[in-house]
């Protein structure tokens, strides 16, 4: 039986690259700003 190895956890993903995590730092805000200017539908994970 095969094993699922690379699942990824939602909590970790949200905490590191979620919207609120991005807004906490200056560079994170730059990321959001850049994605807004490019017209991205999804700004953060």
Swiss-Prot record:
Pfam families: Ribosomal_L34
Region described as Disordered: spans on this chain: 23-45
GO biological process, one term: translation
One Gene Ontology molecular-function label: structural constituent of ribosome
Cellular component terms (Gene Ontology): ribonucleoprotein complex; ribosome
Keyword Nucleus: no
Entry keyword annotation includes Ribosomal protein: yes
Keywords: Ribonucleoprotein, Ribosomal protein
InterPro entries: Ribosomal_bL34, Ribosomal_bL34_CS
Family: Belongs to the bacterial ribosomal protein bL34 family.
HAMAP family on file: Ribosomal_bL34 (MF_00391)
NCBIfam families: rpmH_bact
Name of the protein in its database record: Large ribosomal subunit protein bL34
Source organism: Cyanothece sp. (strain PCC 7425 / ATCC 29141)
The gene coding this protein: rpmH
């Amino acid at each position: 039986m095969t094993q699922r190895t690379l699942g990824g956890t939602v909590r970790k993903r949200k905490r590191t690259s979620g919207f609120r995590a991005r807004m906490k730092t200056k560079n994170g805000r730059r990321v959001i700003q850049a994605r807004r200017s490019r017209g991205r539908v999804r700004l953060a994970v």
